Amino acid sequence: MKSTPQRTDAIRTDATGMWLCRIRPVCCLLFLLSVSFFSSAESVAVPTPSDIEAAYLYNFEKFVSWPSDSGHDSAPFAICILGEDSFGESLNSLIADETHQGRKLVVRRLSSTATANDCQILFIGQSEESRLAKDLSALQKKPVLTVSTLPDFLEHGGMIQFLLQNRKVRFSVNLPAAEQSGLVLSSQLLKVAVSVNTKPAQEATR
């Protein structure tokens, strides 16, 4: 008897289209924009918001350029999670045996920003809301792509904020914050963002 597919397996299947996330980055971004999520127990094969966010995190590295001196060529390319981890095994499954320009992709869970300098992408969890300003201040102008679902994340200096719109996971971008850290976001990524802030934080709040 065939076993019921686990959620982490579902995000790779043709049934959901998430397999595009591993082989066709541009197609994956377009697909992720169209995926609706459901809370019904009958929709087991449909990715959850966290599954979709994990797929975005996995694909962001294909649309962002880091400074050449931001890490050793032989060091792993680290996607880090600070605080509450809502991804379970979804992110681990997506990056298994994957590389970025010859560097092995790894997932790291952090309890503070003290070791975040070794990360290339940092997802800041909900549990960090009260420490958000401090967390982002510690990473200011460092080549770490910061991502979160926290409210007002971009206003605090974060770079990419996930949003839920009409049961779909979308994202907004704070371009100056990324540029000040030496990161270059591709035009393909910016085109599919809900909004792109092009003003530095001090100007945007005037």
Residue ranges and their predicted role:
Residues K2-Q6, G17-C28, S36-R206:
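Short hydrophobic alpha-helices and adjacent helix-cap/hinge residues
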